[in-house]
């Protein structure tokens, strides 16, 4: 839920990047951090394992401007992609205002994408939410590498399996140099 602080005239929204392991969630935040003016961003916080895998979450605070006299702040989070961190995924989703699902475009990742979207549905349900109640962006990542599935095929597969039945206007994404 968007947090309003009328004392400081700030509005803060929580956006969560969700998806399977190694799909590029953390890379997205690194890229945004790199491309955002230093005076509009806070420090990026990453809790990673020794092999650079997200252990708990990544957090990137941004200031994006003023709306209606309120300073708008975004808190961008990632969830760990590994299934055994599901409790952490649920914790990070608590209070979510928007979700960016980062799907890996590689042929070998199709099942992992569908499984992760299904897991997102389950975790939202445990929080009393449905995906169609939360602003949702479906981002197809890694479009610049070989052995990728056409976006239309991935979208059709996800609709057929009812994990993203309302998904429209997919957002293909390439992060030059991997974003780091």
Model-identified regions with their sequence ranges:
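Canonical P-loop GTPase G-domain recognition
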Residues: 137, 144-180
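Switch I (G2) and immediately adjacent beta-strands of P-loop GTPase domains
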Residues: 44-87
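Conserved G1/Walker A P-loop phosphate-binding module
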Residues: 2-51
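Structural beta-sheet core signal
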Residues: 17, 101, 138-140
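Short, well-ordered amphipathic alpha-helices
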Residues: 1, 59-63, 114-125
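Conserved Switch II/interswitch segment of TRAFAC-class P-loop GTPases
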Residues: 79-82, 95-118, 126-131, 143-148
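Conserved catalytic network of the ASCE P-loop NTPase/AAA+ motor domain
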Residues: 8, 52-55, 65-70, 90-95, ...
